[in-house]
Amino acid sequence: MEEFVRQCFNPMIVELAEKTMKEYGEDPKIETNKFAAICTHLEVCFMYSDFHFIDERGESKIVESGDPNALLKHRFEIIEGRDRTMAWTVVNSICNTTGVEKPKFLPDLYDYKENRFIEIGVTRREVHIYYLEKANKIKSEKTHIHIFSFTGEEMATKADYTLDEESRARIKTRLFTIRQEMASRGLWDSFVSPREAKRQLKKDLKSQEPCAGLPNKVSHRTSPALKTLEPMWMDSNRTAALRASFLKCPKK
């Protein structure tokens, strides 16, 4: 699974996932399913934000090619992927600037158009079950929840899906592709079932051979993407936020 993750996801997503796990004392080489889950969640958060801007009137704009107009501002502030101290600093800055209620838990995004924090969920189970778990944990009507599944299902607070259908379809397609690629390599069952994951871990620890069927090289093509993860207070006129060029899983 670890080798699959490193081949399947953009290197910066992998690096951010590793830092996140190490921050909590977890080892990506051992807890490989969690490693895959974190990378997937990060990618969905970045895809959610990608290409979406707002103009000076606060109207939503989608810009998919070239540099956006200087008057446009990224619609979403990406909080996920930052270390906890930086993330809370960003959240506090947003709350102080906009007057929105400070969330109890770190959210994943902030939507400048709708003026709300967003919690993104990616589940291997039923979307409504995971949605209820998120809602019970957050216990706040101020934070918007949007859940995606690997089967193409989604669920959001008050059925408000925030993004246009095409943007959401791009996320669903990517998740379905990840599922298919995992399944083709015999990794999906262990990714879904904790019991199967433990069995697979024991098997992996006994074997030192690399995952079969995975290419040695990955194409590093880039789209309008990954600029910088700057603290938002350093440049009030910034137009750059965390961007990523998402590599699709290499075909067998």
UniProtKB/Swiss-Prot annotation:
The active site is at E80, D108. InterPro entries: PA/PA-X, PA/PA-X_sf. Gene3D superfamilies: Influenza RNA-dependent RNA polymerase subunit PA, endonuclease domain (3.40.91.90). Keywords: Decay of host mRNAs by virus, Eukaryotic host gene expression shutoff by virus, Host cytoplasm, Host gene expression shutoff by virus, Host mRNA suppression by virus, Host nucleus, Host-virus interaction. GO terms for biological process: viral RNA genome replication; viral translational frameshifting. The record marks K202, K203, K206 as: Important for efficient shutoff activity. It is found in: Host cytoplasm; Host nucleus. Pfam families: Flu_PA (PF00603). GO terms for molecular function: RNA binding. The record marks R195, K198, R199 as: Important for efficient shutoff activity and nuclear localization. Its main location: host cell. Belongs to the influenza viruses PA-X family. The probable endonuclease active site in the N-terminus and the basic amino acid cluster in the C-terminus are important for the shutoff activity. The C-terminus acts as a nuclear localization signal. The C-terminus is recruited to host protein complexes involved in nuclear Pol II RNA processing. Plays a major role in the shutoff of the host protein expression by cleaving mRNAs probably via an endonuclease activity. This host shutoff allows the virus to escape from the host antiviral response. Hijacks host RNA splicing machinery to selectively target host RNAs containing introns for destruction. This may explain the preferential degradation of RNAs that have undergone co- or post-transcriptional processing. This is Protein PA-X. It comes from Influenza A virus (strain A/Fowl plague virus/Rostock/8/1934 H7N1). The gene is PA.
